């Protein structure tokens, strides 16, 4: 693709995303489906603005690559070892069972048995990009079903290697094309990558971080991710698997959070590009000529995978309320099918339109998942939140609460308990089904749902409430909810949880002045107790704590425009000197006056 064409394609992608995704979000069908529809609109079977779909689809896989790197950063080798049962137990069972059933059905549809085996394996895989995005949106990341879903996806990525090796064997060309020496060299190169990464990555990043130039650190992070992806691609393996391993190797390093911050903006844009490319690849010509076949295939694929996943979740011990979410989020075909089916086509395993039919089935199955998840969310909301005797009542029965608490993790629980102990009327919204079920057993009024949906907030009593307390785990959800409340419920007094200084700056920029940094207050309190244990008078230690809090908040406000700049470092040094001067100035006065306590802002 020429430079000018690439620029034109980039503009079209951005325009399609900006136009389609907000519209999809407004319709309540989710960003992923919006990207897919945008791809159909600008692709060769839509308005025809872009025709070179294969090249763009290959490039857009970088979105999945960046996503897997960030996921790897959130794990570590010991955590992976803990997940071994779910990865190699449930993951392997899902692939083998689904592939066997689907291959049998393809044979009944006049596929050669070799093509049916490849088709069954490809259809058994799920979309890593879509499933992880939806799990994040639905708050499944930290739930048991979310962890199991991740394990299944990880096994599917690992299964790429033997699946690709199987294609030439099934094509009957093992003697001509299948070289065991090349396979051994690939395994050796893979081992070298593991060992080299284990011992070289941290020293390299330590050297780069010592330069103090943020842009160089970002460039080094991009270099690592892209190099790992290209290396694995050259070996004929999954690019996403390579970057996932690189992330795991750095998961225990001191640079984990900085790496994640450097990659995150690129991940979001490239994931959007990936979904647009998938939409562009939808062959509407095959869909029109084989409409009934494709429609039946999509339904059968989704139903078989959901049944398999639901049964495995039941055997594994997942709560009944979480099984449907787990089964539906992995029910689609995946991006790996495009790679596997292309390889099989080059080996002439498929006949006629068979490959095109399978790819259309995979693409359409990906489009069903957001709608399926939305329907299951509504069903779960009514089942979990609706009163048993009268289903006609709204899902959230507290129509006039004083306070709405969003999120019922450890942070939110403390706040809710304090409010309830003081006879305040509260409504708690939580999107982790397991947490909802558990807390209801203890008598808490907790309701299931995604608080970033305006209708749920309205039914929860946001129009009558005085305050909303936001305790979401994800900073993106917090900021989205803040914007939502400011737009639709401007009367609400917003109080929020900030995980650190960066999020605190974002809240201040958004106009939220009442927030609590979760580790800051507890750290200050422990610091005060430490001063007392070292012999400082309790009153003097309390004043030191209050001065520190006041100065830190002032510095936080002053540094809003430069919260990601090196200015913070010099300002922090000035603040430390200023704090020392305050303490020295007041030391003598505090020794004479040890009664009474200061109020602070």
Curated annotation (Swiss-Prot):
Keyword Transmembrane: yes
Entry-linked PROSITE patterns: RCK_N
HAMAP family linked: K_H_efflux_KefB (MF_01412)
Family annotation (Pfam families): Na_H_Exchanger, TrkA_N
Nucleotide-binding among keywords: no
Subunit structure, interactors included: Interacts with the regulatory subunit KefG.
Location(s), subcellular: Cell inner membrane
Source species, domain of life: Bacteria
Domain (RCK N-terminal) ranges: 400-519
One GO cellular component term: plasma membrane
Stretches that traverse the bilayer: 4-24, 29-49, 55-75, 87-107, 111-131, 152-172, 177-197, 207-227, 230-250, 262-282, 284-304, 324-344, 356-376
Main location: membrane
NCBIfam families according to UniProt: 2a37, PRK03659.1
Bilayer topology: Multi-pass membrane protein
Protein name (Swiss-Prot/TrEMBL): Glutathione-regulated potassium-efflux system protein KefB
A single GO BP: proton transmembrane transport
Keywords, alphabetical: Antiport, Cell inner membrane, Cell membrane, Ion transport, Membrane, Potassium, Potassium transport, Transmembrane, Transmembrane helix, Transport
Origin species: Salmonella newport (strain SL254)
Family designation: Belongs to the monovalent cation:proton antiporter 2 (CPA2) transporter (TC 2.A.37) family. KefB subfamily.
Matches recorded under PANTHER family: K(+) EFFLUX ANTIPORTER 3, CHLOROPLASTIC
Function recorded in the entry: Pore-forming subunit of a potassium efflux system that confers protection against electrophiles. Catalyzes K(+)/H(+) antiport.
Example of a GO MF term: glutathione-regulated potassium exporter activity
């Amino acid at each position: 693709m020429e430079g000018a064409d690439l620029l034109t394609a980039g503009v079209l992608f951005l325009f399609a995303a900006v136009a389609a995704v907000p519209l999809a979000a407004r319709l309540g069908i989710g960003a992923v489906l919006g990207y897919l529809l945008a791809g159909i609109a600008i692709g060769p079977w839509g308005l025809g603005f872009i025709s070179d779909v294969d090249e763009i689809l290959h490039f857009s896989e970088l979105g999945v690559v960046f996503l897997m790197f960030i996921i790897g950063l959130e794990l570590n080798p010991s955590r992976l070892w803990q997940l071994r049962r779910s990865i190699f137990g449930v993951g392997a069972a899902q692939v083998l069972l689904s592939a066997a059933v689907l291959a049998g059905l393809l044979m009944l549809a006049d596929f050669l048995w070799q093509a049916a085996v490849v088709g069954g394996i490809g259809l058994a895989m799920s979309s890593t990009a879509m499933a992880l995005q939806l799990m994040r949106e639905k708050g499944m990341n930290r739930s048991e079903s979310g962890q199991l879903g991740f394990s299944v996806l990880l096994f599917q990525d690992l299964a790429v290697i033997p699946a690709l090796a199987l294609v030439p064997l099934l094509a009957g060309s093992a003697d001509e094309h299948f070289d065991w020496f090349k396979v051994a060299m690939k395994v050796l190169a893979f081992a070298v990558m593991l060992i080299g990464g284990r011992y070289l990555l941290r020293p390299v990043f330590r050297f780069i971080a010592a330069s103090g130039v943020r842009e160089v650190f970002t460039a080094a992070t991009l270099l690592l991710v892209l190099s790992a992806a290209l290396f694995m691609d050259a070996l004929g393996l999954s690019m996403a698997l390579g970057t996932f391993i690189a992330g795991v190797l750095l998961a225990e390093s001191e640079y984990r959070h900085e790496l994640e911050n450097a990659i995150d903006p690129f991940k979001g844009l490239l994931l959007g590009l990936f979904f647009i490319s998938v939409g562009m690849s939808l062959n509407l010509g095959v869909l029109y000529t084989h409409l009934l076949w494709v429609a039946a295939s999509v339904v059968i694929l989704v139903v078989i995978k959901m049944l398999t996943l639901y049964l495995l979740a039941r055997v594994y011990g997942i709560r009944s309320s979480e099984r449907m979410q787990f089964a539906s989020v992995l029910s689609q075909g995946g991006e790996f099918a495009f790679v596997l089916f292309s390889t099989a086509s080059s080996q002439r395993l498929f006949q006629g339109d068979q490959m095109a039919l399978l790819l259309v089935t995979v693409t359409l199955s990906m489009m069903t998942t957001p709608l399926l998840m939305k329907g299951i969310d509504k069903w779960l909301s009514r089942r979990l939140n609706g009163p048993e005797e009268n289903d006609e009542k709204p899902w959230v029965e507290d129509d006039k609460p004083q306070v709405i608490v969003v999120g019922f993790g450890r942070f939110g629980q403390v706040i809710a308990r304090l409010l309830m102990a003081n006879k305040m009327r509260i409504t708690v919204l939580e999107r982790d089904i397991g947490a909802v079920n558990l807390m209801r057993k203890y008598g808490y009024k907790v309701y299931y749902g995604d608080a970033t949906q305006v209708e749920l907030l309205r039914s929860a009593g946001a129009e009558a409430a005085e305050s909303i307390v936001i305790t979401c785990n994800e900073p993106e959800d917090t900021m989205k909810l803040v914007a939502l409340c400011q737009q639709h419920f401007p009367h609400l007094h917003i109080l929020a949880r900030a995980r650190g200084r960066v999020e605190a700056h974002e809240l201040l920029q958004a106009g939220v002045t009442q927030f609590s940094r979760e580790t800051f207050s507890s750290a200050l309190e422990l610091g005060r107790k430490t001063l007392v244990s070292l012999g400082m008078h309790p009153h003097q230690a309390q004043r030191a704590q209050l001065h520190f809090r006041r100065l830190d908040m002032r510095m936080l406000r002053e540094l809003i425009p430069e919260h990601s700049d090196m200015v913070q470092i010099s300002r922090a040094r000035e603040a430390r000197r200023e704090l020392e001067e305050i303490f020295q100035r007041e030391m003598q006065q505090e020794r004479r006056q040890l009664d009474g306590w200061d109020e602070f802002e």
